[in-house]
Design a protein with these regions (language model features):
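Bacterial Sec-dependent N-terminal signal peptides
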Residues: 1-27
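Low-complexity, acidic/polar, glycine-enriched regions of mature
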Residues: 19-195
Length: 195
């Protein structure tokens, strides 16, 4: 009888202890800037412009196969126009837009990742020109055969007026007519990260 009670007690103790097993700690992956990309699209009444911005650095916190946090830094001095317009690039770097001399970097810090597996919703804080605002967007996450993680957000919509970028905005200059530049611009971000 004592043996039976001892066996039951031991079985209950093992089950109880396994329920309180320490959760695994997230692993920090370093974003490989040379394999990662950021593209942008800005639209106006009469057309659009697009180009690239260089990623300076970043990290992704990964627990199992799930991204749980991280962030990245963007080099605002690297803004390029796909058409190679030096005039446009200079204007985007000027104080009318991103003020790259005074604010050479922007950054995004992940505060929450909803969902698990390949399709997630990312929430975080985007800082542009020293102004930080919350931002949420859909993303996909893939664990690659070589052990790297690829996190992709195909369309991040940013309202530039929230970051005191008002140049050409019809929201502030109603009489601007067909010279208006839309308040929202889009980013597409692909981060490739490794342990």
């Amino acid at each position: 009888m004592k043996l039976k009670i001892s066996s039951i007690f031991l079985l209950v103790a093992v089950v109880a202890l396994s329920a309180f097993k320490n959760p695994t700690k997230p692993v920090t992956y370093t974003v490989d800037a040379s394999k990662s990309t950021i593209t942008w699209v800005g639209k106006k009444v009469t057309g659009s412009h697009n180009g690239t911005i260089t990623l300076k650095s970043g990290t992704l916190n990964v627990n199992g196969k799930n991204v749980t946090g991280g962030g990245f830094i963007i080099d605002m001095t690297s803004i390029k126009d796909a058409d190679g317009s030096a005039k446009l690039e200079g204007h985007l770097k000027a104080d009318d837009f991103f003020g790259a001399e005074k604010f050479p970097t922007s950054n995004f810090v992940i505060t929450k990742v909803a969902g698990s597996g390949a399709n997630v919703t990312v929430t975080g804080n985007l800082t542009i020109k020293g102004i930080t605002k919350p931002l949420t967007f859909p993303a996909t996450v893939a664990v690659n055969a070589d052990g790297t993680i690829t996190a992709t957000a195909a369309k991040i919509v940013v309202d530039r007026t929230k970051y005191d970028i008002k140049y050409g905005s019809k929201s502030f200059f109603e009489s601007i007519g067909d010279k208006a530049i839309y308040d929202e611009f889009e980013l597409a971000v692909k981060l490739v990260a490794k342990k």
